[in-house]
Amino acid sequence: MVMKFLIVGVGAIGSAYLAFLTRAGHEAAGLVRRNPVNRIKVEGIWGEFEIPVKTFTKVEEVPFIPDIVIISVKSYDTEEALKKVKPVVGENTFIMIAQNGYGNYEKAVEIYGEGKVILSRIIFGSKVIKPGHIRITVSADEVVIGDPSGKIDEEFLKNLARTFTEAGIPTRYERDVYKYLVDKIIYNSALNPLGALFEVNYGSLAENPHTKELMNRVIDEIFQVIEKAKLPCFWKSADEYKKVFYEKLIPPTAEHYPSMLEDVKKGKTEIEALNGAIVELGKKYGVSTPTNEFITKMVKAKELFNLKDT
């Protein structure tokens, strides 16, 4: 079945959705702030192709009411993007959050209500070579989609997952999608900021006793927050998670550098949706998070230094 998709934010992840859905014959368009692209070249582990695409800078230019609006902007632009697309969000349009980090789904529900927002856990890596040219570098698992509120029809979500898979982005439906998101928040919060601060890959962080101790502290604090905030989670304890983290999760991605490393060089990261969000949740629920707070401030300091250099 041909569907209509509007992808908001045509960066690394958004470009992948726009290119693969267009190639599969769906009516897909991108919404960008500036510099529209008319072709996307894809290379990497999911194959190589180049395809003409439609992108617009104004929401009024979008020539259809989409079935799905995919939000793939950086976390700090989420609220603005959600409000910007309102004119094309029809009665039967769903918002899909294709971002990692805490707070994006919550913002979407605040604006559009439960039963209107699909949450996804993105775990493939895409790198922008230049605008209109991306490389799919890694895929640790399928994309997971679902509705934490349980209000969206399961068959619709299963069919949507099948649509993405048939388009070339392996996806499955999971009722427990929020647990997958929390899992990714723990992983990203432990690895990304330290990788960005020290400019090293994940394997190096695990091998260095000092960064390993910092990661352990980050994880311990996150689990204290998870318990107090009653966030859904696969793991019963920080120790249970750490065992899997060091033995199973890091080895396959040991050579990987965090995307936050590129972001911090440009002076803007998603730290507020990761460790920064843990700090805020800690304050809300009375949990002390000194390591997460220190790392958040370190990343924000590096952002500021790099902004002054640009």
From Swiss-Prot:
Pfam families, per database record: ApbA, ApbA_C
Pathway assigned to this chain's UniProt record: Cofactor biosynthesis; (R)-pantothenate biosynthesis; (R)-pantoate from 3-methyl-2-oxobutanoate: step 2/2
GO cellular component, one term: cytoplasm
Residues that hold NADP(+) according to the record: 9-14, 100, 270
Matching InterPro entries: 6-PGluconate_DH-like_C_sf (IPR008927), 6PGD_dom2 (IPR013328), ApbA (IPR003710), Ketopantoate_reductase (IPR050838), KPA_reductase (IPR013752), KPR_N (IPR013332), NAD(P)-bd_dom_sf (IPR036291)
Binding residues for substrate: 100, 188, 192, 259
Enzyme Commission number: 1.1.1.169
Source organism, top-level taxon: Bacteria
TM region positions: none
Class of enzymatic activity (EC top level): oxidoreductase
Annotated GO biological process: pantothenate biosynthetic process
UniProt entry keywords in alphabetical sequence: Cytoplasm, NADP, Oxidoreductase, Pantothenate biosynthesis
Regions annotated as coiled coil: none
Subcellular location field: Cytoplasm
Catalytic residues of the enzyme: 184 (proton donor)
GO MF assignments: 2-dehydropantoate 2-reductase activity; NADP binding
Reaction it catalyzes: (R)-pantoate + NADP(+) = 2-dehydropantoate + NADPH + H(+)
Described function: Catalyzes the NADPH-dependent reduction of ketopantoate into pantoic acid.
PANTHER family linked to this entry: 2-DEHYDROPANTOATE 2-REDUCTASE, 2-DEHYDROPANTOATE 2-REDUCTASE-RELATED
Family of this protein: Belongs to the ketopantoate reductase family.
Full protein name: 2-dehydropantoate 2-reductase
